[in-house]
Regions:
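Bacterial N-terminal signal peptides that target proteins for export
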Residues: 1-6
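Secondary-structure end/capping motifs
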Residues: 218-305
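N-terminal signal peptide c-region/cleavage motif recognized by signal peptidases
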Residues: 16-18
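Short helix-capping segments at alpha-helix termini
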Residues: 20, 48-51, 149-151, 188-190, ...
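Pocket-lining segment of extracytoplasmic ligand-binding domains
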Residues: 85, 161-258
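Conserved C-terminal helix/tail region of periplasmic/extracytoplasmic solute-binding proteins
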Residues: 290-332
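Short, glycine-/small- and polar/acidic-enriched structural segments
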Residues: 22-179, 196, 204
Length: 332
């Protein structure tokens, strides 16, 4: 398996080579190896990328990495971005990147509450005090929550990615990620928290968005198409097939992850339709639509997260998705 750390890269990977050679590309993830990138590891490990003529290196991210900058600098060809806000900000700041697929139809961002204390429904949460929210969230999804549901800034306490304060305060709420924090709370606190997926309450951004540079789309559309198709097939195989080799690869790259965590993450992605739901049921995994992009852009403008008047359509292209690739791989 060709997975490298960021320090190994001194220059851009080129596409040139003999006709019989696989096209070499590097895909950077936005975090350390985990099931949330499982479809890409699956496509690498089960030979799907090779079948599509690609020699893919997965460059795992982490707390000190910046794969987005590597993409801009030409050090990698594809990057696993976060949500659509980053793509809007790229347009706003004239950064020449573009979204070519969305492998999470729902953003896994959640809020959690303690059960049985009057915070069991979404409509109970705006008055919860304290609300443990990170600095980055205050100006993104919390801004939407404040506008759409009346959540209060006065209730915020800093969330430093440690759930102990939330566990200790029964009337608090805390942000989290569907596939990780609920299990952490269950392990450390001894209870199952209430989980509220923001996507189910109107936070309609895509996530795990495959990004590349505009020049690659213009000069090498065939490579982009093959990478998108193979990655989407990888996600079908990871969710519905034998994912053991991908999980072993994830554990090699991230020795701290446990089998329980992997199983929990995969289970939640399937239970909540993170990858395969909505438009993907007809268009295929990775699907995107103009309506979703325009709707979320308008929502973020109203919330003050992005500027009005930018050409948000430059943030993405539908050229490589919505072709039904892999639909036959979903269990009947």
């Amino acid at each position: 398996m060709r997975v490298a750390m960021m320090a190994a890269f001194a220059g851009a990977i080129t596409f040139a080579g003999p006709a019989f050679a696989l096209d070499k590309v590097t895909f950077g993830t936005n975090w350390v190896a985990d099931p949330e990138a499982g479809g890409y590891y699956q496509a690498l490990e089960d030979g799907t990328y090779a079948k599509y003529g690609l020699d893919v290196t997965i460059l795992q991210g982490g707390p000190t990495s910046n794969g987005g900058m590597l993409l801009i600098a030409g050090k990698i060809e594809f990057f696993m971005g976060g949500d659509m806000i980053g793509d809007f900000l790229a347009v706003q700041n004239n950064i020449p990147t573009i979204a070519v697929a969305a492998h999470f139809q729902k953003n896994p961002q959640i809020f959690m509450s303690h059960p049985g204390v009057g915070l069991d429904k979404w409509q109970d949460l705006p008055n919860a005090n304290p609300a443990f929210v990170s600095a980055g969230a205050v100006n993104t999804f919390w801004a939407w929550m404040r506008l759409a549901y009346g959540f209060k800034d006065d209730n915020i306490k800093p969330y430093n990615f440690n759930s102990a304060p939330f566990i200790a305060e029964p009337h608090s709420i805390q942000q989290g990620y569907l596939t990780s924090e609920p299990l952490e709370v269950e392990r450390q606190g001894g209870f199952k928290p209430n989980v509220f997926l923001l996507a189910d309450y109107g936070y309609t951004t895509y996530s795990t968005i495959v990004e590349t540079r505009r020049e690659i789309v213009e000069k090498h559309p065939d490579i982009v198409q093959r990478f998108v198709d193979a990655s989407s097939i990888g996600w079908y195989h990871y969710l519905y097939g034998d994912n053991s080799k991908a999980n072993e690869a994830i554990k090699r790259e991230n020795p701290e992850i446990t089998d329980d965590q992997i199983a929990f993450s995969i289970g939640k992605m399937k239970e909540y339709g993170i990858v395969d739901s909505g438009d993907t049921l007809k268009l295929g995994v990775g699907a995107m639509t103009d309506e979703r992009w325009s709707g979320f852009y308008n929502t973020m403008v109203k919330a003050g997260v992005v500027k009005s008047g930018i050409d948000y359509k430059k943030a993405y292209t539908l050229q490589f998705v919505n072709k039904g690739v892999g639909l036959d791989l979903r269990p009947k």
